[in-house]
């Protein structure tokens, strides 16, 4: 896992953690510093096969210990922060606009993530394929039509700067 993420590729995922050197040495294999969004067999990032095996084994063992059918062993982090942000600004049934997965939109801003689980009406932002971001003119039109409670630019992959000032002015 460490070889894949630190030697074989240039990791562009902003969610990758930088750990305390002692914690990194303790974990030696680097598993604790990798985001692992999604369920085993259906991850959003690549190269997580070892983590998936550990998640399945750990979940099975915890479920067995507590005599349950299922156990969630993954530590909540950024997803919980996103949920709390949605809860602070919106209520169930409100509409939000966010970037689609095709330009790196974060899973927590979509139906399978906390936005959908919180009951938000999620509309994908129009995109500018040339710059891998939202199309400001089309977004402005969509926002005027839909009147969203929130427009977010949250993403898992940010290759270029997002037009934060332009979105803020909408």
Where are these regions (language model features)?
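Conserved PLP-anchoring active-site segment centered on the Schiff-base-forming lysine
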Residues: 90-106
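Catalytic PLP-binding core of fold-type I/II PLP enzymes
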Residues: 161-170
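Gly/Ser/Thr-rich loops at beta-strand to alpha-helix junctions
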Residues: 18, 76-80, 103, 156-160
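Short catalytic-loop micro-motif centered on adjacent basic/acidic residues
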Residues: 11, 70-73, 150-154
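PLP-dependent aminotransferase-class I/II
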Residues: 108-153, 158-162
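Conserved N-terminal alpha-helix of the aminotransferase class I/II PLP-enzyme fold
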Residues: 35-80
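N-terminal "arm"/small-domain region of PLP-dependent enzymes with the aminotransferase-like
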Residues: 1-42
């Amino acid at each position: 896992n460490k070889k894949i993420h630190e030697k074989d590729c240039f990791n562009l995922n902003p969610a990758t953690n930088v750990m305390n050197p002692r914690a990194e040495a303790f974990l030696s294999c680097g598993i604790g510093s990798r985001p692992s969004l999604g369920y085993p067999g259906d991850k959003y990032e690549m190269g997580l096969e070892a983590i998936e095996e550990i998640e399945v084994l750990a979940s099975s063992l915890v479920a067995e210990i507590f005599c349950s059918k299922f156990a969630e062993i993954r530590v909540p982090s950024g997803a919980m922060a996103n949920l709390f942000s949605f809860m602070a600004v919106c209520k169930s049934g409100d509409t939000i606009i966010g970037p689609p997965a095709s330009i790196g939109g974060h899973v927590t801003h979509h139906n399978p993530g906390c936005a959908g689980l919180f009951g938000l009406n999620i509309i994908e932002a129009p995109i500018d394929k040339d710059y891998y971001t939202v199309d400001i003119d089309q977004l402005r039109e969509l926002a005027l039509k839909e009147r969203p409670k929130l427009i977010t630019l949250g993403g898992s992959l940010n290759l270029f700067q997002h037009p934060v000032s332009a979105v803020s002015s909408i």
